[in-house]
Amino acid sequence: VGTLPGNILCVTFTNKSAAEMRQRIHALTGDEDTGYICTFHSFCVTVLQEDSHAVQYPRRFLVLDNSDIDAMLRIIYEERGLTLRAMTFSAARDMIELRKLKKAPQYYPDLITLSLETLQQKYLQAEAPDDILFSGYPYTQKKCFGLDYNDLLKFTLYIFEQDADIRLKWQQRLEYIMVDEFQDIDEQQYTLMQVLCGYHHNLFVVGEPDQTIYTWRGANIRYLLDFDQVVPGPRTLQLMENY
């Protein structure tokens, strides 16, 4: 079709699936450049490494896994005299994530726009253990420019919402967007795909309603079932053979 690999985004849910797709395409084409074949989070890392200046973060920000988060929590516990009897690190991670996503819509604007000094002040003023952890987490994050997995999506969406030039750049770059396992997509991932295909309007999705496995973390099967009602002029193909 005359489209370069770098103008195609193919998103799946696991690094293993993405690696398998890259291997298959390389075997078919012999081309080392297989385009953007990645998970949602990996794609967001790519966006942020290119455009993190829009949120005053360095290109070499840290991607935090659970062990990194636990190390940050340990600092907060020690600084504020908290104990694991009150709340384990695992429970603290869950509490913070729940409040970030459900109860504190101002969390991300604050993390992005407030100074380190202001975040520190909010942390030191907190008294209840939950509030200490919830205010100490963004302060500790910003000190090391660290982002956890959910932050990657939120920061990317924030940049696209706030900066029309950056949004248009990525929309124009990605001529074709393909999403695997669409039955497991959640609200943030769906919004990201809507934004990215807002220029070329070429969106291809693959899904099986009976195979959804991520409803426990926010996946909404309605995005697949209602696809032909939301997207103008779609074409639906039934895949009857397993490849």
Kindly give the residue locations of the regions a language model identified:
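Conserved helicase NTPase motor core
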Residues: 9, 36, 65-68, 123-226, ...
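Class I S-adenosyl-L-methionine
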Residues: 19-22, 26, 74, 138, ...
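ATP-hydrolysis module of ASCE/P-loop NTPase motor domains
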Residues: 32-35, 53-150, 236-242
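ATPase/helicase motor core of nucleic-acid motors
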Residues: 43, 78, 229-231
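Residue-level signature of catalytic and energy-coupling elements of molecular machines
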Residues: 14, 39, 73, 148, ...
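Short amphipathic alpha-helical segments
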Residues: 22-24, 49, 74, 190-191, ...
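P-loop NTPase Walker
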Residues: 1-57, 63, 144, 168, ...
